[in-house]
Amino acid sequence: MKEKRKPPHKTRFVAFVAASVDGRISLTKRTPPDWTSKEDWRFFQNSLSKVDAVVVGWNTYQAATVRLRKRNTFVLSDRLNGLRRRGSVTFVNPSSVDLAKLLSEYKSVAVLGGGMVYCTLLGNNLLDEIYITVEPLIFGRGKEMFVGCTRTTRLHLLSMRRLNRSGTLLLHYGII
């Protein structure tokens, strides 16, 4: 009797974004979102405990180097050719490496930003879901949520939850 082979698993890519009401994810480069609510931080930490790897951009990595060294971390940067590993951190140029193949050994990958990273994964049809925490703040300046996207992406709302009395919202979208 022939043994049935399991179909290969598909890696699930989930983006996590903390944003102001005007869609800003940071006031300046390399600053962690220390302006988010404790409820968002709790949700974020709980979510990260369930993933196998994280994908970040260079500035996000610089802002959170110590915390990211403890995980399987992939840092996207167009400043290098190919791929370079340093412990549990892999630095990779997304235009010279097949990201889907590189990350295929993982079941669940958290995409933590910044704006160019979100667009890179959207452009490669890798994102499956996006969680956006909207904090009740207006910055009026700063880094945008999505930078360099070259096409329109349709989303469908999976859930919406109010996290606190201040009005912090957690939006959960699926990618269509």
Task: Report residues per predicted region.
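Enzymes that bind and transform nitrogen-containing heteroaromatic metabolites
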Residues: 1-176
